[in-house]
């Protein structure tokens, strides 16, 4: 039996209380687990959960986000998103977000794991209006090699789109040794992390430079210094990429850079989501 889960989240700013008010509607097993305000009323932390625990062939999960002017949402998950083996059907996740002027979004799900023989598609689209800004990450692990469960069969299609700013579409096949093992590709690593900060306008030159400088300093102090890098591929965004043998060191690096960028760009404390500590 396949599942179709659809979650709609709408955020608006209440100026009387300086509060981000959230409304949600869901169909199927995808829903909000927690709504928290650990930083005060202006920033809403949402924890999304898919109760069946994983996505199998034939399943489709859709998330639609709408951020009104002045709202600020942080969205994460309590655990990894897991694509399990498929008998031939595609498992899909689609995330679509619209950020109005003056809104902020932090898209910070925990890692995605592609299990052996999965056939998966993951599509992320973030429309950012002038005056809005977001930071987000995507962390993909191919199999669980440390547990003796390598990714030997299957495919994974990843699309990440910031219209007018950045479009990336990559199809990864488990049989593509040239991509996965070449020093010009994954270099034998099995975890790829991407972290970005983007605005609806060109980032001020001083801000872009400060973000890159801080990330390079943290990369230089990391065990992943040889497989991580940061650049500004477009005037509106700064992007970091990292390859790692396991999820933990990649997530540690992304978390450190997220804390630095949050302070530099928004003058906010790191505020690690509580669900990550449980």
Swiss-Prot record:
Q: Name one GO molecular function term.
A: nickel cation binding
Task: Please verify whether the record's keywords include Metal-binding.
Answer: no
Q: Where in the cell is it found?
A: Cytoplasm
**Family annotation (InterPro entries):** UreD (IPR002669)
Q: Which domain of life is it from?
A: Bacteria
**Does the keyword Coiled coil feature in the UniProt annotation?**
no
Tell me which GO cellular component terms the UniProt record holds. cytoplasm
Name the keywords, alphabetized. Chaperone, Cytoplasm, Nickel insertion
An example of a Pfam family matching this protein is UreD
Assembly notes: UreD, UreF and UreG form a complex that acts as a GTP-hydrolysis-dependent molecular chaperone, activating the urease apoprotein by helping to assemble the nickel containing metallocenter of UreC. The UreE protein probably delivers the nickel.
Entry's family note: Belongs to the UreD family.
The record's function comment reads: Required for maturation of urease via the functional incorporation of the urease nickel metallocenter.
> This chain belongs to which protein, by name?
Urease accessory protein UreD
This protein's gene is called ureD
């Amino acid at each position: 039996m396949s599942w179709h889960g659809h979650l709609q989240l709408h955020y608006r700013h209440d100026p009387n209380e300086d509060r981000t008010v959230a409304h949600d509607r869901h169909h199927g097993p995808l829903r909000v687990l927690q709504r928290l305000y650990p930083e005060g009323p202006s920033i809403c932390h949402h924890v999304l959960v898919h109760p069946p625990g994983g996505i199998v062939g034939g399943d489709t999960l859709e998330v639609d986000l709408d951020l009104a002017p002045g709202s600020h949402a942080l969205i994460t998950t309590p655990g990894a998103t897991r694509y399990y083996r498929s008998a031939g059907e595609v498992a899909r996740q689609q995330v679509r977000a619209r950020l109005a002027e003056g809104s902020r979004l932090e898209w910070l799900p925990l890692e995605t794991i592609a299990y052996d023989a999965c056939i998966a598609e993951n599509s992320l689209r973030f429309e950012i209006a002038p005056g809005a800004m977001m930071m987000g990450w995507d962390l993909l692990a191919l199999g669980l090699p440390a547990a003796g469960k390598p990714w030997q069969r299957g495919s994974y299609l990843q699309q990440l789109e910031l219209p007018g700013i950045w479009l990336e579409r990559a199809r990864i096949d488990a049989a593509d040794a040239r991509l996965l093992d070449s020093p010009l590709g994954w270099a034998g690593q099995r975890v790829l992390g991407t972290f970005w900060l983007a605005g609806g306008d060109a980032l001020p030159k001083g801000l872009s430079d400060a973000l890159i400088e801080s990330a390079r300093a943290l990369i230089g102090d990391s065990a992943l210094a040889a497989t991580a890098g940061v650049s500004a591929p477009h005037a509106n965004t700064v992007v970091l990429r990292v390859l790692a043998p396991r999820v933990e060191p990649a997530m540690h690096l992304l978390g450190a850079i997220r804390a630095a960028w949050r302070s530099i760009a928004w003058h906010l404390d790191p505020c690690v989501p509580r669900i990550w500590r449980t």
